[in-house]
Amino acid sequence: MKIYGVGAAEGIGIGIAKVVKEQSVEVVKRAVSDTEAEVANFTEILELTKTETEEMSKSLERNASAKEAEILVGHIMLMSDPMLIDEMVNLIKNEKICAEYAVEGVCNQYAAVFASMDDELMQQRAADMRDIKNRLIKKILGLESNDLSTLPHGSILVAKDLTPSMTAGLNPENVFGIVTEFGGKTSHSAILA
């Protein structure tokens, strides 16, 4: 079998392939009667996710470089955007819908806008929005995320795509290579690799 792709980093890596499948989450529109409690839960999860992202960013800055940490700083900025948060909160309150459905709808709208832009770097913001969306929804639903920090020494990570938050958890001493179906030289996973 031959696989063709674009090299994003110099050199080669020889190791054992570790295939990572990102679990898909199906979000169902669900009515809520206590919108204040739903907003409070959403706000708590949003703050927790921002704190975790800040910790990942600081860890990256200590262990890699500021360039990689900036990607996650961008996530924090997006999760702190009052317009974005207000849209989600207003959907929960006005439509009386669950937080995960509001997060999915608003993040998908923003991701579509970023993806339609001509600038390749701005298009990467679509991946940021999808990453933020998936992390928030999993936390709201109480689901676990992939933990890539425990990959064994000599791993070649193979995935459809890697989100910035997934890549930030990698131990660079253990990962000898990364192969993804999506992305290119300017993708976050290539930058983090």
Model-identified regions with their sequence ranges:
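Non-catalytic, soluble scaffold/interaction modules
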Residues: M1-L192
